[in-house]
């Protein structure tokens, strides 16, 4: 999104609060905050990470519904969302502190189910930049149609008809 678009988004009321760098030093300081966020999560009592994408028009309602759902599961979780919002890519991470760390691992299943349900509702993707991997493979069938899954298999078969390259992996 260019500077003009940011100004328009602010003027049109699409953005209610923003920090826009006025200098190169401020731009770098903002970028440093974004770059150090994943490292800071390691110091928390627990984290549930995600890398999703959504249509831009769905970002605000998705976020609002997620906050409501997350608070019902654990009101003490910290929500850390950042990413390439102009592209609809969002790192939506849930961070446990000492209050929410009790059985956090058992809560992760419910948190991820909520996340994937909302991503599917808004026609998003459960993986924006980092692929499906083994951890999201079971969720793929819940958020993609059988036709899309067939196309994905056909693409893999056309590249690797003998299934020699990364057998069982998703393209």
Q: Across the structure, where does each feature detected by a protein language model lie?
A:
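Electropositive phosphate-/nucleotide-binding environments in soluble metabolic enzymes
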Residues: 56, 60, 109, 142-149
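Activity-critical C-terminal alpha-helical subdomain
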Residues: 137-171
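C-terminal substrate-recognition/cap domain of FAD-linked oxidoreductases
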Residues: 4-107, 114, 118, 122
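Alpha-helix capping/hinge segments and adjacent helical runs
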Residues: 120-132, 161-165
């Amino acid at each position: 999104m260019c500077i003009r678009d940011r100004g328009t988004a602010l003027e049109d009321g699409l953005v209610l609060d923003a920090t826009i760098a006025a200098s190169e030093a401020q731009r770098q300081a903002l970028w440093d905050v974004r770059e150090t966020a994943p490292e800071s999560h390691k110091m928390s009592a627990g984290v549930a990470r995600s890398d999703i994408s959504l249509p831009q028009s769905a970002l605000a309602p998705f976020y609002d519904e997620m906050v409501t759902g997350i608070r019902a599961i654990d009101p003490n979780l910290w929500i850390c969302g950042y990413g390439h919002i102009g592209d609809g890519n969002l790192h939506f991470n849930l961070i446990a502190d000492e209050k929410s760390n009790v059985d956090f691992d058992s809560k992760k299943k419910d948190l991820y189910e909520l996340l994937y349900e909302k991503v599917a509702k808004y026609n998003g993707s459960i993986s924006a930049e980092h692929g499906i991997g083994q951890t999201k493979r079971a969720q793929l069938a819940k958020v993609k149609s059988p036709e899309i899954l067939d196309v994905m298999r056909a693409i893999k078969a056309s590249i690797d008809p003998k299934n020699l390259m990364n057998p069982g992996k998703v393209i």
